[in-house]
Amino acid sequence: MNIIIGLLVTFGCILGGYMAMGGHLEVLNQPFELMIIGGAGIGGFIMANSMKVVKDTGKALGEAFRHKVPKEREYLDTLGVLYSLMRDLRTKSRNEIESHIDNPEESSIFQSAPTVLQNKELTAFICDYVRLIIIGNARSHEIEALMDEEIQTITHDKMKCYHAMTTMGDALPAIGIVAAVLGVIKAMGAISEAPEVLGAKIAAALVGTLLGVFLSYSIVGPLVANIKSVREKQNRLYVIVKQTLLAYMNGSVPQVALEYGRKTISAYERPSIDAVEQEMMNPGGGSESKAA
């Protein structure tokens, strides 16, 4: 919604201000200039990136428009799963715990947290490190180094589309100049025409420069910033898992270990301690009541 509102404000102010100055919108209607700039930008983007990054960019744009970031329910589900696993680590046998992490789809713990189970990467991350804790030989600082390395890799992969779009956006003003030069070349072919005809052709050529700068700083730039924000918030779930499990490995009881994870959540989205306690007593209760 923020993206739609921002686009409406941007177009409304720019076009409204232009018309208020006495400008004519038909002069800005240069579809072939837009084709040159858009085609060159997208073509360069495809050349510079693998198809995985291209596809992930489309996915990231969809996530940005839908603002697909973790909500309170997802944070509570993640904390609830971690609490249940840590509690079982203290009270149940290795075989019982392995039954949950070997087949999370059939696990009552993960089934009570559908938002976690839907996130295959996060589920695998949790299961992998709980398995390492079960083994019992790894020290907490070794697990921490391993977690940091994996989170860094996940972040690097998720940010590839951000860096790719940033590069494309930075190139658009220069591509706009290319479109403008092509327009000037065309205008020079009509140098013997009447001044008003030549002026119209030069004005059309200058639209290329305008479009390049406008697309770069008013469209692509803000979209890229939104993508970065969304992906960073999605990665926060991994940090929650890391801090919670490390606190448990360092001797904290499950209730206290959850606080280490909860405190890593931004204050704007952080669930209250009462909500976390309720989740510990009734895992997945929020989603069940929501479904009811």
From Swiss-Prot:
Q: Where in the cell is it found?
A: Cell inner membrane
Q: What Gene Ontology terms describe where this protein resides (cellular component)?
A: plasma membrane
Pfam hit, one? MotA_N
| PROSITE patterns linked | MOTA
What is the membrane topology listed in the Swiss-Prot or TrEMBL record? Answer: Multi-pass membrane protein
Q: Which InterPro entries match?
A: Flag_MotA_CS, Flagellar_motor_stator_MotA, MotA-like, MotA_ExbB_proton_chnl, MotA_N
Predominant subcellular localization, coarse grouping: membrane
Per UniProt, the keywords (alphabetical) are: Cell inner membrane, Cell membrane, Chemotaxis, Flagellar rotation, Hydrogen ion transport, Ion transport, Membrane, Transmembrane, Transmembrane helix, Transport
Q: Where are the membrane-spanning stretches?
A: 3-23, 27-47, 171-191, 204-224
- GO BP annotation list: bacterial-type flagellum-dependent swarming motility; chemotaxis; proton transmembrane transport
Protein function: MotA and MotB comprise the stator element of the flagellar motor complex. Required for rotation of the flagellar motor. Probable transmembrane proton channel.
Family per record: Belongs to the MotA family.
The record describes its quaternary structure and partners as: Each stator complex is composed of 4 MotA and 2 MotB subunits. 2 A subunits and 1 B subunit are thought to form a single ion channel, so that each stator complex contains two channels.
What is this protein identified as?
Answer: Motility protein A
Q: Which organism is it from?
A: Rhizobium meliloti (strain 1021)
Q: Top-down, what is the taxonomic lineage of the species of origin? A: Bacteria, Pseudomonadati, Pseudomonadota, Alphaproteobacteria, Hyphomicrobiales
- Annotated gene: motA
